[in-house]
Amino acid sequence: GCTDVRHILVEDCLFWNAEFGNTLEIGYETRCDEITDVVFRNCDVVHCQYEGNQSGGVLTIHNADRAHVHDIVYENIRIEDAQEKFIDIKTLDSKYSRDRERGMVNDIFFKNIEITEGAFPVSIIRGFEMKNEVCRPHGFYFDNVVIHGEKVMSPGELHMVVELSDELKFQ
C-alpha cells in the first residue's frame, strides 16, 4: 500500500515552472488514505507556463485517486506570471487514476496570495459525479487574495468556475 502524507512544509522557495506540470501541486496520484497538513509558505512563483492540457496551474490539487486531501495551506505566495490557471482544484478520473473511488478535498486555505503582474488566468474548483459516486470539494477559505493590487471577494472576481463544490468563503 501507499503511505499517508502528513506534516509537509514547503517554505522560502522560488519557482519557475516550464511546460508539462503545475507549480505548487498536490496530485494527480493520490493513492493513499490521507494527505493533510501540507503548507506552502512564503514562496515566489516567477513563471508558470501555458501548457494547454490539464496542467499549467499555479496553486493546484488534482485528486485523481482515493485520498482525503484536507487542511492544506497556501500562505504568503507571490505570483509574477501565471499563464493558464491560477487556482485549479479538482476531484477527477484521469489517465493517472488507479483507485476505483475518488477522494475528497476540503479545508483548503489561501492567505495573503498575490498576482503582482502578468496575466490574470481562470481558476477552477470542480467536484466529481458518476452514477453512484459524488465527491463535492468544500471548505475553501480566501483571506487577502489580491490580483494586480485589487483584493478579490467572490468567485466571480477571481475568474473562478465552481462546479459540484461549495463552501467558498472570502474575507
Predicted regions and their residues:
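Extracellular/periplasmic carbohydrate-active domains that bind, remodel
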Residues: 1-171
